[in-house]
Regions:
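Glycine-biased, small-residue-rich flexible motifs in mid-sequence functional cores and linkers
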Residues: 45-47, 53-167
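Short, small/acidic-rich helices and loops at N termini and domain boundaries
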Residues: 1-57
Length: 167
């Protein structure tokens, strides 16, 4: 059912959805949680963010296959998360010169072989940020997966790259 139905029938969730985490029922029965959800939605609207749920066709199909896939993805920008070709690049935060060069060369060559590939990484120091910069340099779409909320860019020094990714 809808989110409103889940909320209105929160006490019945264990019977309706066997295996539901009891913490979910407790959280739904907390007025502060409802207020927090309203604040989140205001933030989403104010900052022109988008969200996808597991039921949305545009939700990343590969991620949906994971047992612990997030129920909701918040994002900013425009991309097809279900592209045929996706490469995830993550690595050390203390990238060596060799690692940085390999990242640049790999994405340069990949852009020639597969120009529609989507590059996914974090926004952390090291290989993550180098992957995004190399993707941008090669005109490849790139997506940053953040471990924190969308209310800030961290590390802040990567703000320009994050803005460039949205252009």
């Amino acid at each position: 059912g809808s989110a409103a139905e889940v909320f209105s029938r929160r006490k019945e969730l264990p019977e309706i959805m066997p295996g539901v985490n009891p913490g979910v029922v407790t959280a739904l029965d907390c007025p502060a949680a409802f207020l927090r959800a309203e604040q989140e939605m205001e933030f989403v609207e104010k900052n022109r963010l988008s969200c996808l749920t597991l039921k949305d066709e545009a939700y990343p199909s590969r991620l949906r296959e994971c047992e612990d896939a997030p129920i909701v993805l918040f994002f900013k920008g425009n991309t097809d998360f279900n592209r045929l070709h996706v490469v995830d690049m993550v690595g050390t935060r203390r990238a060596t010169d060799y690692g940085k060069q390999f990242c640049a060369d790999f994405l340069r060559d990949l852009a020639v072989l597969c120009p529609d590939v989507l590059v996914v990484s974090g926004l952390a120091y090291g290989i993550d940020i180098h992957a995004h910069r190399a993707a941008l340099a090669n005109h490849l779409p790139t997506v940053a997966v953040l471990a924190h909320g969308l209310d800030r860019i961290y590390p802040y020094v990567h703000r320009k790259t994050a803005i460039d990714m949205l252009a």
